[in-house]
Amino acid sequence: MIQMQTRLDVADNSGARQVQCIKVLGGSKRMIAGVGDIIVVSVKEAIPRGRVKKGDVHRAVIVRTAKEIRRPDGTSIRFDRNAAVLLNKQNEPIGTRIFGPVVRELRARKFMKIISLAPEVL
């Protein structure tokens, strides 16, 4: 569960290390985002010579959350930290690699590029 002001790790090689959620997209009163939801983020930490700089504003899709995800078969999955992948205006990943596992709920949200780049889909 991600809300405004939440800090997330970045799970790609776009150059950002940590981002902060500044808006949850999808309705004027929407407050909370989960896995597969698109949010607007500000880059808080970045590596030198990366594609993005500190202070840049981008869209991002959430790929891992510390709050467990319940599945229809009764299982649940959770991670140690929250993580996101930065997107451009066309909702395509900025980076060319994805680090760490992602959940298969992204497939239903049509993020096939992220699914194919990820080393593991849980």
From Swiss-Prot:
One cellular component term from this protein's GO annotations in UniProt: cytosolic large ribosomal subunit
Keyword vocabulary terms for this entry: Ribonucleoprotein, Ribosomal protein, RNA-binding, rRNA-binding
Domain of life of the organism encoding this protein: Bacteria
Magnesium is among the record's keywords: no
A Pfam cross-reference name: Ribosomal_L14
Described purpose of this protein according to its UniProt entry: Binds to 23S rRNA. Forms part of two intersubunit bridges in the 70S ribosome.
HAMAP family: Ribosomal_uL14
Protein name stated in the entry: Large ribosomal subunit protein uL14
Gene symbol of the encoding locus: rplN
